[in-house]
């Protein structure tokens, strides 16, 4: 199964908030918008600014974000994606969600890639399902792939451990 990763799922894996997704890393290929790096870094920067994480944890999470981005096919935000994001969608999504949806539609139309969407964002999921995309969080038959596990807070070296999911 190919998946399109949204930052909400990456952040959940990285921060250990909520239940971790059992399908993490168990995909044939993963795609994400170039927005993923920015969205994840901004979320971590916000936690740091609010004093919820220290400098060491911020650096460790930043490294993990880069590792995830290097393991995923990052799709550039092109003019055609931005144009498509401005077109009507089946539900009210807002700008960033529209860009994510347009990215999935571009992957499908221009490259023949049919992704299931991995997101914790209900509005994004609802719109994606209206467009015919499957919810990756509900899919169980997947092929294992090596993806990094989230950095443990107690890991003093700050190294991410690779995990064969």
Predicted regions and their residues:
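Short, well-structured N-terminal submotif of metal-dependent ribonuclease cores
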Residues: 1-38, 47-59, 143-148, 153-158, ...
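Alpha-helical elements of the RecA-like P-loop NTPase motor core of helicases
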Residues: 12, 42, 83, 125-126
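Short, polar loop motifs at secondary-structure junctions
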Residues: 14-17, 120-124
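Active-site neighborhoods of divalent-metal-dependent phosphate/nucleic-acid chemistry enzymes
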Residues: 72-123
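C-terminal binding/interaction regions
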Residues: 113-115, 122-126, 131-165
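Helix-adjacent hinge/juxtasegments
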Residues: 51-77
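Short glycine/serine- and small hydrophobic-enriched flexible loop segments
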Residues: 42-49, 105-106
